[in-house]
Amino acid sequence: MHDIEILRPDLPRGHFRFVLFDFDGTLSLIREGWPQVMIPMMVDVLRQTGTGEDEVTLRAQVEEFVMRLNGKQTIYQMMQLGEEVKKRGGQALDPLVYKHRYHDLLMARIEGRIEALAAGQATPEDWTVPGSHALLKNLQSRGLTLYLASGTDLPFVRREAELLGLTVYFGAHIYGALDDYQNFSKKMVIERLLEDNKLRGEELLGFGDGFVEIEEVRRAGGVAVAVASDEANRRGVHAWKRARLIRAGADIVIGDYRQQGPLVDYLLTDSPLAGKQSSHG
């Protein structure tokens, strides 16, 4: 697999003023493994409806909607879970109940990582996609304004970004899920960003590992870099993520930011891409 895969060779380059980043899986690895928490929890909930479906079928169905909604606020995945319970004749709980159950299970998995970062026993580099800090520093030094928008609840995003030494790059432009979920979406952040800054679509660059942000950046006329990060191994491209993100409309696919220098040069100038790459017409 190539380090930088160009899927739209004629993409508009050199005009970017603002860059939008997703958080989990795009910059932060603190929540690495979240699907292994969410999917079994949901399969368990659906099994309790008394459905006749086997484990493999249930898991495939849950995985499909969980990953399709990845990038939106977590509550949407829980709302879909409620719909799936009803479809099977079960009594659905409030989506917030499911969300809190999931969050408790996830925290049991990741609280050691957060504590290690807070105590200085782990470094930000241990829990970020390789090359994240270098990329953000490079973009900021070239005068671009950076935004962070996450489907994770805002207080957690702020805390985890701070622990990872990322707040300095985004300042006040850190957005996350709100209790009143209808008042936040990545689409809303993008629309406000374009409107407030009188931006044309080609002046927006986006980085993300979720279907939603890739789709929304492209819809706005921006350029979408899909970060198909292999979060567990921290190297290379995750083939399943790559396939999904290409379907979402990715312009470029990378696995991490080890090649951020040539990538940024390519995006911000009209020079050809240096180094290892592949192009698809």
Model region roles, listed by residue range:
Residues 96-97, 167-183:
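A short, structured active-site edge motif that brings together acidic residues
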Residues 175, 251-259:
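Short acidic-hydrophobic, aromatic-tinged amphipathic segments that line or gate anion-handling sites
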Residues 184-217:
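Conserved Lys-Pro-Asp/Glu-containing loop-to-beta segment of HAD-superfamily phosphomonoesterases
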Residues 26, 38, 121-128, 132-162, ...:
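Substrate-recognition element of Asp-dependent hydrolases with the DxDx(T/V) motif
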Residues 1-21, 58, 63, 67-70, ...:
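Non-catalytic pre-domain segments flanking phosphatase-related domains
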Residues 2-60:
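Active-site neighborhood of HAD-like aspartate-dependent phosphohydrolases
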Residues 150, 206-252:
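Acidic, Mg2+-coordinating phosphoryl-transfer loop and its flanking beta/alpha structural elements
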Residues 64-141, 145:
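A metal-dependent, Asp-based hydrolase signature
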